[in-house]
């Protein structure tokens, strides 16, 4: 049976911590979809389309990874698209407390047997979050080594564009 996995987040921006989880998950499953969640409550740095394009470009070398976006319940998206695994990344025990609660709720909502698999972020990336990256970048700090090169270029270009306004 082909395994179709889903890894979700807002990815605004995609960080090296996200990349680490995606790269490792891509080796475990036949197909991996990076599901970009639309969250109107969050002020986004990049549009959904920009995030999707950046993720697709960054993940090209992996071969079996694609990006998509969705809104609404994760369980609805999983059931509609036939995923058998939901991958979640963990940085700390605080992440685990939240993620286990969500996994248990989702298990009630999934139509079929869908497993939630937790992958620990590598230690070098455990302190990285999209929020921290955005804050450091907005204050003029270096985010090199915190995000993939494609994302770094896009963030620098966005900053330059905003300075010109």
Give the role of each language-model region.
Residues 1-165:
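Nucleotidyltransferase catalytic core that binds NTPs
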């Amino acid at each position: 049976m082909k395994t179709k996995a889903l890894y979700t987040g807002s990815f605004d921006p995609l960080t090296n911590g996200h990349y680490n989880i995606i790269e490792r998950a891509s080796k475990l499953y036949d197909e991996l979809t990076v599901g970009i969640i639309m969250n109107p409550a969050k002020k986004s740095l990049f549009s959904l389309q920009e995030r999707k394009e950046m993720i697709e470009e960054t993940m090209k070398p992996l071969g079996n990874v694609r990006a998509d976006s969705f809104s609404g319940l994760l369980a609805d998206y999983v059931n509609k698209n036939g995923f058998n695994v939901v991958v979640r990344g963990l940085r700390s025990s605080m992440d685990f407390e939240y993620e286990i609660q969500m996994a248990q709720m989702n298990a009630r909502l999934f139509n079929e047997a869908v497993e939630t698999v937790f992958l620990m972020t590598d230690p070098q990336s455990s302190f990285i979050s999209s929020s921290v990256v955005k804050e450091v970048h907005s204050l003029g700090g270096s985010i090199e080594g915190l995000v993939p090169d494609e994302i770094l270029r896009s963030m620098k270009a966005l900053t330059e564009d905003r300075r010109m306004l």
